[in-house]
Structures are given as C-alpha cells and as structure tokens.
Amino acid sequence: MLNPYKPNGELINLEDYPQAAAYLISHREALQKRHVAKKNPGKWYKTIDRIVPALKDSPKVLLPDISGNQLIFVDDGRFYPQHNLYYITGGSLRQLQLLSAMLMSDYVKSQLLSITNCMNGGYPRWQSQYLRKLVMPDVNAIEESLAERLLGAYQAFDMARLNDTMADIVSAPRAKSHRRQPQVQQLTFDFAM
C-alpha cells in the first residue's frame, strides 16, 4: 500500500519521493477522475481517508458495511482495513473476540435491524452511527464461565451455542450494558473501566 502522507499527517511533496511519484504519475489519469482530486487538483494523489500505518499492526474487529454473512472476524494485526470495511480497536485480543461474538449474536442483529436502513436484500449496515446505539454487555463484566462459553462458540462458529450463551449473558443480573462512544477513526471502543 502506498501512503502519500508523512508521519505528521501532511501530504508528501512528490519531488521528495521520486519512486512514489513515478508510480502515482503512471496512474495520474485515473486518480484525477476521483471527486477528491477534482476538488483539489494540486493534490490529485491525495486519498480520501488518511492512512494510519500503526493500524495495520493493531488487533481489530473487521466489519463490512453491508454483508449477508453473519460471521465477524478479528484481525490480530496483519491487515489494513480499507473502503467499506469498518474496524473496532481497543482492548486485548480476547476482549475483541468477545465483542465479535456478541456482534454476531441474534441479540445484536435484532437491535441493528430495528435501527438501521437495511440494504441489499434486507441486510443491516455496520456503520458507526448505528453501532453507537447498540446496548451491549460490558466485556469486562461477563462472568468468566460465560465468557469462555461465548469464546468457544465464537471460535467454533457455533451460532446456536453463541446465541444461547449471549441470552444467558444478557439475562445475568451482574451484566452491565453500556453504549460505547467512538473516540477516533471510524469506530473505536474503549475497554477501560
């Protein structure tokens, strides 16, 4: 992936990066047709979103904008999300897997279906404006035996067991629910207590 930004977030000067310039110039015609380039012709090689190199190495939940697939995956730090792929960062890999399991549940799906505009055959959208409205159990407040059961169901893609476990978590008297607010980038959950 070619990142046209300096570490401080400024767009690079192509004269200072001849190899990047050669590559970008070879695709200039196509790049100039984009809305972002038409808006600012002097910065025709600018990307719509700034690239954050550290994001690639961070564990994250990957969410497609629209998908008929009920499975949600956690990247342990090998991929960079682009285009219509949202991500959630924060917490440990285990916490992100618990969050993914909860997001795959019928409990969350029913909430999403009631608050989103469904697209492409009735599939809900995973945009942050909708995710902010979800009522979710606090991953740090889930009883350990239920957390292990939920992780086992998630790792086995056993949706029946996952939904049964999620129902037990939601009905548990000690489970706290929180509406999480994004902090930076597309969507970030803060797992601090």
Label each region the model flagged.
Residues 1-148, 152, 166:
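Polybasic, glycine- and aromatic-enriched phosphate-binding surface used to engage nucleic acids
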